[in-house]
Amino acid sequence: MNSSALPHVTIFTDGACSGNPGPGGWGAILRFGEIEKELKGGEPHTTNNRMELLAAISALEALKKAASVDLTTDSQYVRQGITSWIHNWKRNGWRTADKKPVKNADLWQRLDTALQPHQVRWHWIKGHAGHDENERADQLAREGVALARLK
């Protein structure tokens, strides 16, 4: 499908954890034209990498129809995993090069599925470096940690 025919959505995501593992949260900002939506959530016992993945997954799953997406994360783990490592993992039956099971394979598989209807361009920015949207996603993720503590 021609990406210019698809609606364009900009997404910023972040994950946070208090202790690793520990209570964690994720946050996402979705922008479509003038419309902006904020998402957040958390889990009582998780890792930072799982929260980074869940932020991207939740944002993509929130899209109701196919879109051209620019997704920005401060997680090299997510960006490298989805743009590079996942191809070999899938080919190797969700095992790493040294034949160990891929960590967080459940979420990588869910992210892979969430991507399917969309054309996604992945962007990385340095976290805590004054990027307004990343700072807001971080705040949402920290609110998610607070929610997780209540569970």
From Swiss-Prot:
UniProt KW Magnesium keyword: yes
Domain RNase H type-1 as annotated: residue spans: 5-146
Cofactor(s) for this UniProt protein: Mg(2+)
Binding sites annotated in the UniProt record for Mg(2+) 2: D14, D138
Keywords: Cytoplasm, Endonuclease, Hydrolase, Magnesium, Metal-binding, Nuclease
Gene3D superfamilies from the UniProt entry: Ribonuclease H-like superfamily/Ribonuclease H
Keyword Magnesium: yes
Entries under HAMAP family matching the protein: RNase_H
SUBUNIT field: Monomer.
Identification of the protein by name: Ribonuclease H
Organism: Nitrobacter hamburgensis (strain DSM 10229 / NCIMB 13809 / X14)
Gene name for this UniProt entry: rnhA
